[in-house]
Structure formats: C-alpha cells, structure tokens
Amino acid sequence: MISARQLAFLILRDINRRDSYTDVAIDRALQKHPLSPPDRRFCTELVYGVVRRQRTLDCLIEQLGDRPIGKQPPDLRRIVQLGLYQLRYLDQVPASAAVNTGVDLAKANGLKGLSKVVNGMLRRYQRAEEQGKNILDQEKISLGEQYSFPDWLMELFEQTWGKAETESLCAYFNQNPSLDLRINPLKTSRVEVAQSLAELNLTTTAMAGLPQGLRLGGKTGAITQLPGFAEGWWTVQDASAQWVAQILNPQPEETIFDVCAAPGGKTTHIAELMGDQGQIYAGDRHGWRLQKLAVTQQRLGLTSIKIWEGDLTQPGVKPPVELVDRALLDVPCSGLGTLHRNPDLRWRQTPATIATLLPLQQALLKAIAPLVKSGGTLVYSTCTLNPAENEAQIERFLQDHEDWRSEPFEWTSPQGQTNSVTSGMLTILPHHHHQDGFFIANLKKA
C-alpha cells in the first residue's frame, strides 16, 4: 500500500504540473489510492499544510540550500517542503522520521542522486532548531514571507485592518478550518444529531444565534459516512454561511429567487426555514453546478426548489419569475474570507482576477433589483474581506437606485451577544468570530 507521505508528494506534484485545485487533486488521489482513516488525515494535513505555508517553506529552502530555489528541480522542492513542514509545524512527527522519509521519497521518485541534498537541508534545519536558532530573521523577512501570503494581499489587509489585525487574521488563516453542520429540522433535531455523533466519540457544540447550527469536533473520517448524512438529517455549512438565509428571513408561501444558487447550501437553507412551503427559484449560469444542488435537494427531501439555468446579466435572458418577495444574491467573489478552507486561493487570486469580478457583481445587482416587489428584501453576500467587493458595491448600488435602502437587522456573535447592525451591512471576521470571513448586506425596496 502507498504511504501517506508518498501520496502527499504525488498530489503536490499533480497540483504543480496540472495546476489542479488542492481539494480536487486530493479527492482524485484518494479515490485511486484509498488510505486508512489516520493515513488519510495525515496525507490531507501534509498537502494542505504545504500549500498554505508554501512561501515560508520556500524562504527556508533559500536559506538552507546551496542553489537558488528557481534552479532546483520542482520535485526536489516538493520533497523538501514536505520535510520542512513536518519539522516546523507538526510536533507529533519525530524529527528523525521527517528527515528519513524525505530521503526515502527522493530515492523512490527518481531523485536518488539528490537524496543527500534533501538529507543535508533537513538536517541543517533540525540542528538549527535544536540550537534554538531561527533561520528566518524576523527583522529581514516580510510579513508575507512570515505568514505565507502574497505581498499584494498583505497590503490589502493592512490597508483595511491595520498591521496587528492583519497578523492575527493571517495566523488564523494558517489553521485548519472548523467543521459546521446545519441540521434539517424537517427530518430531525439538533439534539438527535448530537446524540448520534456522540456515539462515535465526536463532540458537538450548539452555535449561538443559529438554531440549526452544530460545530463538530474530533476525528470525523469521511463526512459522507457519518450517521444522518445519507438520510438528509444535516448538511455541511459554515456558521457564517448559515447567517445569510437567516438574515434574508424567508416566510412560508413566499416567492424567493436565489440568483447564484449552486451548489445549493443557502438555497436548501431557505427551503428549510420556509418549512418547504413556497416557491424558491434557484438560478445559476453553470448547469454542472446546479446538478450538485439537485443532488443535495433530493438528499434533504426538499420539494419547493425549482432549478433554473441562466445568466441574468446577459441581454435578452428571461428570468424564471416576474416578481419575488425576497432575493438572495450570493455573488461570485474572490473568496478571501475562506483562505483557511481554500489555501490555494491565496496563490490563485490577484488584483487582476478580482478586477474582473467587480463589474459582474455590479451587473447582477442591477439585474435583480427590478424583480423584487415593492417592500421586498434583497440580501447581498460574499465570502470575501475585500471592501471593493463588499461595502463599495452596496454604496454604489444605493447611489444608483433611490428606491432602495439599507435595512438594519440583528446578529448574534459566537460569544452569544446579540447586536443591532444599524448600517444593514455586516462583516464577519474569522479571527474574531472563529468562522469564515463573510460580508452580508440587507437591503429593502421602497
């Protein structure tokens, strides 16, 4: 059987050679090479960890190696990154194991002649650690190198939150994400789900302000194998995302339009909040993503959702409904609030890619506005912490649409404190609230 470290190396090589998304590459490899649950967790930790800490690890390699990193074979770099990640960040791995398995990986993957290079760099780092020396001089390296983020992103965060907040935020983004469930009240209760998971020695915590929310702790294994998944008792959804439908506050028998609905987490939440009574139109321009929504809808036993494939921003496209009571616009965004959950986003997004999202977000706001009834509600949400995609978009929309205004709402923090969001715009900060970074705006039509 293939080892967890060997599979982690193959996945990292796949990501490098094919520009694969991390989660896709991991799923593909684990389907081909099934591992035991502990090895599966270790392999996943190694891959996500190396992708997250890539820039910091490369700084270490520059200090430890005799050749510039750009002149080293990519496969050698991956093997050394794996070894350094274990030495620097995984206390449970003995240093000797991290070094010796790194040498073994080099020999097993066509780099036998460079195995001494791997051994030399890893042992050099190990000796420095044992002597209490910090190879990375905190005064000489940038914050981006220290926390493993691109400089442009650090500058964006510093301009928005300041240096101290940025360091706390980036430290949070380098941790493993929490796992939150949303209980389906049409089939079960939070207590029943918690009891079924407790039998597997999994801990659960009810989340303040979220009647359907349950935070899961412990070694879960494959999510789809947990009790209640196949039965539609629950679905995975971060606490921040659960707030979106709650703020929309849909009522039974209303007509709702979820404009960018796939893969369906918020759509199905809307249906649950309405008791599956009403008309919910779930739109998306990608049919393959809507197929995922259909699967989730069926698993949860919901019948009030009607799927519509289309793009409201395109000329001549007829919407699936003329007027709605409420609309949800969870726009395509840069995802900068989920960098702990999607570590490769920090390397994929650039100021240029974000610039292409801004006109799309504006066009979607403009397209949905006429479809909401007078007195109706529009909730705009993103999972980013970029003000240009958040507050700036809402301020521009309100300037251009005098018949719309921000609507205050109440929000309960994870600490259980309920506050009135008088501006109608909420930013959830990961390092303060221990959940995904989100922006939610509540808008009311005159």
From Swiss-Prot:
Gene3D superfamilies: NusB-like, Vaccinia Virus protein VP39. Its main location: cytoplasm. It catalyses: cytidine(967) in 16S rRNA + S-adenosyl-L-methionine = 5-methylcytidine(967) in 16S rRNA + S-adenosyl-L-homocysteine + H(+). One of its GO terms (cellular component) is cytoplasm. S-adenosyl-L-methionine binds at residues 260-266, 284, 311, 330. Keywords: Cytoplasm, Methyltransferase, Ribosome biogenesis, RNA-binding, rRNA processing, S-adenosyl-L-methionine, Transferase. PROSITE patterns: NOL1_NOP2_SUN (PS01153), SAM_MT_RSMB_NOP (PS51686). The active site is at residue 383. GO terms for molecular function: RNA binding; rRNA methyltransferase activity. Its EC number is 2.1.1.176. One of its GO terms (biological process) is RNA methylation. Belongs to the class I-like SAM-binding methyltransferase superfamily. RsmB/NOP family. Specifically methylates the cytosine at position 967 (m5C967) of 16S rRNA. This is Probable ribosomal RNA small subunit methyltransferase B. It comes from Synechocystis sp. (strain ATCC 27184 / PCC 6803 / Kazusa).
